[in-house]
Amino acid sequence: MKKLQRIFITISFLFLFVNKGLTANENFYDKIDLFSEVLNKINKEYVDEIDQNKVMDSAINGVLQSLDPYSAYMSPEMFNSMQTETSGKFGGLGIEVGMEAGVVKVISPIDNSPASEVGVKAGDYIVKVNNIQVQGKSLTEAVDLMRGPVGSDIEITIRRRGIKKALIFKITRKVIEVQSVKSKTIDNKVGYIRLTSFNENSSAQIKGEIIEINKNKKIKGFILDLRNNPGGLLSQAIKISDFFLDSGEIVSTKSRKKSENRKWFARKGDVIKGKPLIVLTNYGSASASEIVAGALKDHKRAIIIGENSYGKGSVQSIIPLKNNGAIRLTISKYYLPSGKSISEVGVTPDIEISEANEDFKMNTKTDNQLNFAIKLLNG
């Protein structure tokens, strides 16, 4: 326990020192004094031997998660795993998750991933992992439970709105390869582009696909499918929005410091030359997806079809720490050209079409949202 005792002594000494002359923050430092006292009591009187690292990690994570659902602490192991996942190939279930009121919530399943193949949907709540309750655990702890070797099985219990009975899915972990851009021509008249995430190559790939589709002189219009796209790089959302606009504001961000507030504007040059554009969204469309859909809607450049988007209107920065871990911290909020915030509200479709039924599967005969968009463009 000597290591933990040194932590208590350091905390107490540090905040006794900085407390002098800081009357405006007295209550804040009193709370830290209280925190130190509580840790000391745990150290001396708790019934079992405690895992010192786990206690401190949970305390740090608790501070961050009290700010919003997206700020969190990542241990060195978690940070390393995150860096592996952003390389575009990793082992797992293939879901993007967040926290809502202490419950793990699916933001979106990745296309063709083990989770999407068994029927996990955006908006589902994960309540158990291998029969272990995850409610009350941190997001980091819940994600750790879901990790495992490629080829191993996992059972997750889900609650879904509108369904009384819990749903249980058995999933085999696989290597997840993220292909962010897919395209095709439908009925020789409609250019269809599916974007699953906003990574560093997305804008260049989309522009290349548009150029290729435009070689067909019979193309009447385009569909940009952002369903189940949890977001990604802000820079890519701006570039992709700019492809379809000739002028005007795309998005703005507001930070704690006014000097860091920013606005981005479109440059002249619509790559589809004014042809009709439809954007498909659903509850799994979040963050960067909402920037694109919101900007194109506000400028009346596209018709938004599908369901209301997720409502994640904030920017997170990954800040490395000395222990080789990191914190994910919200540093600013997005605002659409209309001045509206995306946070919690999301982007409302111009034409609302819900997923038809349990047989609904994107980009198939049961995809009523895509089918409606195709009919609209074909006239």
Predicted segments, located by residue:
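An acidic helix/loop motif centered on a single conserved Asp/Glu
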Residues: 50-68, 239
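Cleft-lining beta-strand/loop regions that shape enzyme active-site pockets
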Residues: 21-31, 35, 39-52, 105-108, ...
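PDZ/PDZ-like peptide-tail recognition elements
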Residues: 58, 70-108
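Bacterial N-terminal signal peptides
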Residues: 9-20
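Cysteine endopeptidase catalytic domains of the caspase/legumain-like
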Residues: 2, 303-304, 377
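Conserved P-loop NTPase
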Residues: 316-320, 327-356
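Conserved functional hotspot residues or short segments at active or partner-binding sites
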Residues: 341-379
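Bacterial N-terminal signal peptides that target proteins for export
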Residues: 1-8
